[in-house]
């Protein structure tokens, strides 16, 4: 997977307690900022989950496409030439008999 593992979850951030000191930070301001961080974490986690699902789906699709027999250019060209020949016979063959 990735080299960096996420160490915090939104729940960890929400439940984090800070010691109060005489000249500490404004608790309401810290709480509001932590709420923003939690929302970002949740959004990032949701996006990561969606991207992982899409990645897995695309990998399955690639595997399925690789399993299908590849149509060679020679076979395709032969088919086109055969169709063209049949068409010429159909179109020009009628004119010969008219």
Swiss-Prot record:
One of its GO terms (cellular component) is cytoplasm. Residues 34-71 form a coiled coil. Keywords: Cell cycle, Cell division, Cell shape, Coiled coil, Cytoplasm. One of its GO terms (biological process) is regulation of cell shape. InterPro entries: Cell_cycle_GpsB, DivIVA_domain, DivIVA_fam. It is found in: Cytoplasm. Its main location: cytoplasm. Forms polymers through the coiled coil domains. Interacts with PBP1, MreC and EzrA. Belongs to the GpsB family. Divisome component that associates with the complex late in its assembly, after the Z-ring is formed, and is dependent on DivIC and PBP2B for its recruitment to the divisome. Together with EzrA, is a key component of the system that regulates PBP1 localization during cell cycle progression. Its main role could be the removal of PBP1 from the cell pole after pole maturation is completed. Also contributes to the recruitment of PBP1 to the division complex. Not essential for septum formation. This is Cell cycle protein GpsB. It comes from Geobacillus kaustophilus (strain HTA426). The gene is gpsB.
